[in-house]
Amino acid sequence: MKKELILKALKLRDMGFPSGDIAEELNISVKTALYLTLNGEELLKAEESPKEDSEKLDIFLEWDNVRASSRRLRNISKIICDMLSDVEFDGVVGISSGGVPLATLISDELDKNFSIYVPKKHIHTEKEKTTGFIGQNMSSIVGKDVIIVDDVMTSGNSVKETIKYLKGIANPKKVFVVMDKSGIDEIEGVSIEHLFRTGVVDIKK
C-alpha cells in the first residue's frame, strides 16, 4: 500500500478528522479509510505489505493538480456542460464537499439554480443520522428537474443517499461524476455519467 497514502490518512486522523471525512479527502472508501487509521502504524512498520484480498482492494485517486486550480476546474466543468447539451433541467445539486466547486461552476456556466446536498457522513452528532440535508437554496429546486454532481464516486452510497433524498422534493435526472471507481451505471433509476472510470484487471501468471 502506498506509504504516502497511509501517512496522509494518519495525519488527518490525528487532526481529528472522522473516517468519512478522511475518505472524502483522499478519494478512498470509508472502509479503506477506517482500515488505514486503525492499522496505519503497523503497515508502515511492515517491510512489505501483505497481499490483500479483493474485499480490501481499493484504488487511490489523486487529482489535486486539477481541483487546486479554479481555471482547470472550470475546464472540467465545461466538459460536463457539453455532456449536458441534450439534457433539460432546472437546477444543479453538488454533493458536499467534493462536488460543490464543480456544481457551482456548472450552474454559473449554464445559468441554472444551484444547491448543495450534505451527506449524513459529514454530519457529526452523537445521534445517528439516517439522512443528510439540503444545505443551500432548497426552495430553488423543489419540484424541479435537477442533475447531481460529485467529483469521485467510490461505493455509490453518497450518490444513492442524495438521489433518495431529492426524489422526495425534486426530480433527479442524471448524475455526473469526474471519476467513477464503482462501475455502477444506474442508481435508483437515475443514470450515472462519468468522465473517467477506473477498474482492476486481475492478471494471473
UniProtKB/Swiss-Prot annotation:
This is Transcriptional regulator GfcR. GO terms for molecular function: DNA binding; orotate phosphoribosyltransferase activity. Contains an N-terminal DNA-binding winged helix-turn-helix domain and a C-terminal regulatory domain (or effector binding domain) resembling phosphoribosyltransferase (PRT) domain. Belongs to the purine/pyrimidine phosphoribosyltransferase family. GfcR subfamily. HAMAP family: GfcR. Keywords: DNA-binding, Transcription, Transcription regulation. InterPro entries: GfcR-like, PRibTrfase_dom, PRTase-like. The keyword Ribonucleoprotein does not apply. GO terms for biological process: pyrimidine nucleobase biosynthetic process; regulation of gene expression; UMP biosynthetic process. It holds the Pfam family Pribosyltran. NCBIfam families: PRK02277.1.
